[in-house]
């Protein structure tokens, strides 16, 4: 019986004690628990990944919706700006047309006033000339009557 034999016997006794103490079962249970824990962690990771993908898809959808809404807002603002520009242009054209019409009316009134003033001056001049010609050719009594008659005729034609 040499040392190898006694080492073998010690090994067999050690293995018997380990089996008697149910160490392989404890190791198996520990490994099974660890495997179950890893499976749960993997399942949680898979669930979290799916949720993250869903959130990412939702954020992409919301971003596209926000971009579309922003585009709609910009298009609406452009339409409103164009409408306001057209309205301002139309209002300006109407204002200019009204001002032109008013200026034309003032010019026409001024022309009429000028023509009336020239006519009045011409009448006054004609009356004065007629008066001086008649004064030279007619005596004083006839002069007064003739002048008054002519003045009455001119006044009746002007009114």
Curated annotation (Swiss-Prot):
GO cellular component: plasma membrane; proton-transporting ATP synthase complex
Annotated compartments: Cell inner membrane
InterPro entries hit by this protein: ATP_synth_b/b'su_bac/chlpt, ATP_synthase_B_chain
Pfam entry (one): ATP-synt_B
Annotated TM spans: 1-21
Taxonomy, superkingdom: Bacteria
Keywords: ATP synthesis, Cell inner membrane, Cell membrane, CF(0), Hydrogen ion transport, Ion transport, Membrane, Transmembrane, Transmembrane helix, Transport
Topology within the bilayer: Single-pass membrane protein
Primary location group: membrane
Record-level Gene Ontology MF annotations: proton-transporting ATP synthase activity, rotational mechanism; proton-transporting ATPase activity, rotational mechanism
Coiled-coil residue spans: none
HAMAP family on file: ATP_synth_b_bprime
NCBIfam families membership: PRK09173.1
Assembly description: F-type ATPases have 2 components, F(1) - the catalytic core - and F(0) - the membrane proton channel. F(1) has five subunits: alpha(3), beta(3), gamma(1), delta(1), epsilon(1). F(0) has three main subunits: a(1), b(2) and c(10-14). The alpha and beta chains form an alternating ring which encloses part of the gamma chain. F(1) is attached to F(0) by a central stalk formed by the gamma and epsilon chains, while a peripheral stalk is formed by the delta and b chains.
Similarity comment: family membership: Belongs to the ATPase B chain family.
Protein function: F(1)F(0) ATP synthase produces ATP from ADP in the presence of a proton or sodium gradient. F-type ATPases consist of two structural domains, F(1) containing the extramembraneous catalytic core and F(0) containing the membrane proton channel, linked together by a central stalk and a peripheral stalk. During catalysis, ATP synthesis in the catalytic domain of F(1) is coupled via a rotary mechanism of the central stalk subunits to proton translocation. Component of the F(0) channel, it forms part of the peripheral stalk, linking F(1) to F(0).
Name of this chain's protein: ATP synthase subunit b 2
Record organism: Brucella abortus (strain 2308)
Gene encoding the protein: atpF2
């Amino acid at each position: 019986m040499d040392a190898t034999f006694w080492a073998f016997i010690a090994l067999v006794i050690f293995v018997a004690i380990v089996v008697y103490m149910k160490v392989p079962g404890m190791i198996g249970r520990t490994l099974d628990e660890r495997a179950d824990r890893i499976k749960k962690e993997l399942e949680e990771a898979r669930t979290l990944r799916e949720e993250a993908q869903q959130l990412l898809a939702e954020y992409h959808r919301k971003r596209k919706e926000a971009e579309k809404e922003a585009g709609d807002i910009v298009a609406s603002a452009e339409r409103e700006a164009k409408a306001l520009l057209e309205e301002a242009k139309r209002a300006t054209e109407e204002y200019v047309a009204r001002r032109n019409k008013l200026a034309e009316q003032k010019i026409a009134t001024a022309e009429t006033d000028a023509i009336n003033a020239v006519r009045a001056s011409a009448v006054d001049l004609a009356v004065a000339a007629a008066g001086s010609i008649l004064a030279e050719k007619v005596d004083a009594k006839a002069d007064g009557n003739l002048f008054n008659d002519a003045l009455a005729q001119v006044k009746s034609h002007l009114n």
